Amino acid sequence: MKRTFQPSNLVRKRRHGFRSRMITVTGRAILKKRRAKGRHKLSA
């Protein structure tokens, strides 16, 4: 059985990156919450 986590920086950026967060309303809500919490890193 292969492992479930097969790291790829491209897929990581496309799925969880800042620009992908910005295109959806819920994604923007996530960024807003993370800013409010004071997260140093907003997205992947």
Curated annotation (Swiss-Prot):
GO terms for molecular function: structural constituent of ribosome. Pfam families: Ribosomal_L34 (PF00468). One of its GO terms (cellular component) is ribosome. The keyword Disulfide bond does not apply. The keyword Transmembrane does not apply. One of its GO terms (biological process) is translation. Keywords: Ribonucleoprotein, Ribosomal protein. It comes from the Bacteria. Belongs to the bacterial ribosomal protein bL34 family. HAMAP family: Ribosomal_bL34. NCBIfam families: rpmH_bact. This is Large ribosomal subunit protein bL34. It comes from Rickettsia typhi (strain ATCC VR-144 / Wilmington). The lineage of its organism: Bacteria, Pseudomonadati, Pseudomonadota, Alphaproteobacteria, Rickettsiales.
